[in-house]
Design a protein with these regions (language model features):
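Conserved ATP-binding module of the ATP-grasp superfamily
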Residues: 132-134, 152, 164-197, 223, ...
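Short acidic-hydrophobic, aromatic-tinged amphipathic segments that line or gate anion-handling sites
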Residues: 53-65, 133-141, 165-168
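A conserved helix-loop-beta module that forms one wall/lid of the active-site cleft
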Residues: 99-165
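Phosphate-binding site of ATP-dependent enzymes
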Residues: 168-224, 275-283, 341, 345-354
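ATP-dependent carboxylate/phosphate-activation module, predominantly the ATP-grasp catalytic core
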Residues: 192, 200-256, 288-323
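C-terminal structural cap/anchor segments
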Residues: 278-358
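A long amphipathic alpha-helix within ATP-dependent nucleotide-binding catalytic cores
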Residues: 228-279, 328-350
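ATP-binding N-terminal substructure of ATP-dependent carboxylate-amine bond-forming enzymes
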Residues: 1-111
Length: 358
């Protein structure tokens, strides 16, 4: 069975990303693994002059599409004979650029990712799996009536809590209706309770269920958005979820993963789940059809545990990011993910725009 390490040596990958931290799921000295990103003070410290990392110097931070169109990036890809391109979040524009240059884009199609992630098309895609969602309906914004119960209102496209609104009063509702009267929205019953998430991998053979973590959401001063995810804690689920609830969570993740597999998906996806504090039931809240933002840090935690177990002679196989690449390269897979039950991170989302170094 070909390992990821040997596959990368003969079939290298370049991760092209606006933010270099998205690409740090593998050690930077991994043979056959390249990164192209923006030149920031943080990126320079991380790259430390490595020849497999190209940092683009511009006055403003470039997005992934702009990096792919940059001549320095294109020359770097050509000089290193790289055919495989990996990005954080695929778009139709990125697909067009890769096709033009005869690069193989490893990410699943942008159209499929959008269908799965968008709040309205997701309902049709889920089919019978909508049983895992809280009570919900699709409506035109202006037609929604206030019935004295709080609810969640979502636009079709939302990311890290943007486009998601907690409607607590009739005034809250009217403010949105005045701005977006004709917009289709998803209306969902508000479920009060802690949020959980995890990172899973669809391989060609099975669904790998990742480590459940507590989702830190809407915490000031790290964000000014009440539903924005700003961190993760891998130790809390053992304290907050019973064994039966963990099984219920894994059943939801597996069902979503199998639906993704049937749709042609490969690689990472995440789910967000809420525990109803009144009924102890778990509800599916969101599907992230892409590499979730917590992947890099989780993989670092797994790598640290792996080194410890290697020294003890009990090494487990792959990190979440390694499994992601293994799946995207369509390699045979006979491993499980490294389990972790400790570690946490906080992300500052309210901050000035990042300027590229000069």
């Amino acid at each position: 069975m070909e390992t990821l390490a040997s596959a990368l040596k003969s079939n290298p990958i370049v991760y092209v990303t606006r933010d270099i931290e998205r690409a740090l799921g593998l050690p930077l000295d991994t043979s056959g693994y390249f990164i192209i990103s923006n030149s920031t003070s943080f990126a320079k410290r991380i790259a430390n002059g490595r020849t497999n990392v190209l940092l683009i110097e511009e006055t403003e931070v470039l997005d992934t599409r702009e990096i792919l169109e940059n001549k320095l990036a294109q020359n770097f890809i050509k000089e290193n004979s790289i055919k495989n391109i990996l990005v954080f979040k695929n778009t139709s524009q990125i697909e067009t650029i890769c096709k033009k240059h005869d690069w193989k884009l490893l990410n699943p199609s942008a159209a499929l990712a959008n269908k799965v992630e968008e709040k309205i098309s997701q309902i049709e895609w889920l089919g019978e799996l909508t049983k895992y969602l809280p009570p919900h309906r699709i409506a035109i914004c202006k037609e929604i009536k206030w019935d004295n119960l709080p609810f969640i209102l979502q636009f079709n496209r939302a990311h890290t809590g943007q486009g998601t609104f907690f409607i607590q009063t009739e005034t809250d509702l009217k403010l949105i209706q005045e701005k977006f009267p004709e917009r289709p929205v998803r209306v969902t019953d508000y479920i009060k309770g802690p949020m959980f998430t995890n990172n899973n991998v669809v391989t060609k053979e099975k669904i790998l269920i990742g480590n459940i973590n507590y989702q830190i959401t809407g915490l000031t001063p790290f964000t000014d958005q009440p539903f924005s995810t700003i961190g993760n804690d891998w130790s809390l689920p053992d304290k907050l979820l019973s064994p039966d609830q963990k099984k219920q969570y894994c059943d939801i993740a597996t069902a979503v993963g199998l639906r993704l597999m049937a749709s042609g998906w490969k690689g990472l996806f995440g789910i967000d789940v809420v525990l109803d504090e009144d009924t102890d039931k778990l509800y599916l809240i969101e599907i992230n059809a892409r590499q979730p933002a917590s992947t890099t840090y989780e993989s670092m935690l797994q790598e640290a545990k792996n080194k410890e177990q290697w020294n003890n002679g009990t090494m487990e196989p792959l990190t979440t990011f390694e499994a992601h690449l293994t799946a995207l390269l369509d390699l045979d897979f006979d491993f499980d993910l490294i389990t972790i039950d400790t570690g946490a991170q906080i992300i500052l989302r309210v901050q000035p725009p990042v300027q590229s170094s000069e």
